[in-house]
Design a protein with these regions (language model features):
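The feature captures the beta-strand-to-loop junction immediately N-terminal to the Walker
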Residues: 56-58
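Conserved ABC transporter NBD signature motif
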Residues: 79-87
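Short coil-to-helix segment of the ABC ATPase nucleotide-binding domain corresponding to the Q-loop/switch region
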Residues: 117-122
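A short, flexible loop at the N-terminus of ABC-type nucleotide-binding domains that lies
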Residues: 17-20, 29-42
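ABC ATPase NBD coupling module
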Residues: 88-105
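Conserved Walker
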Residues: 64-65
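Helix-to-loop junction immediately C-terminal to a conserved catalytic motif
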Residues: 71
Length: 123
């Protein structure tokens, strides 16, 4: 059972109306020494225009790893990620960074505000 204390909610807001996100059989493994730890297995996700999605799950269930993949901050071990019908899994880091800056907003449930900054400056 997922309780309030063990749940972290991550919200992805796709900022541009034309944005479409599609994940196909995405997998992510982390290498720790000689071992591979599978974090995500065969994730499929499709978003529609103007859609806001929430990812809810227990601590350690892979929510942050999924967000990092969508935001281009991690590379999938396998599978494909499409953004505006372009496969971003084949793009360079610079190209993915440009897309992220222009089109993807990520809000984590726990965040820290910088004192003396306005709400806009903290974003």
């Amino acid at each position: 059972m997922v309780t309030r204390q063990s749940t972290i909610i991550l919200i992805i807001k796709l900022l541009f109306m034309s944005v479409l996100l599609n994940l196909k059989k995405v997998n992510l493994k982390y290498q720790t020494g000689k071992d591979n730890i599978r974090v995500l297995k065969d994730i499929n996700l499709t978003t529609k225009k103007k859609e806001t999605i929430s990812i809810v799950g227990e601590s350690g269930s892979g929510k942050t790893s999924l967000i990092m993949l969508i935001g281009g901050l991690e590379k999938a071990t396998s599978g494909k990620i499409f953004f505006q019908n372009h496969e971003i899994t084949k793009l360079s880091e610079d190209e993915v960074s440009e897309i992220r800056r222009k089109s993807i907003g990520i809000i984590f449930q726990s965040f820290y505000l910088i004192p003396n900054y306005s709400a806009v400056e903290n974003v």
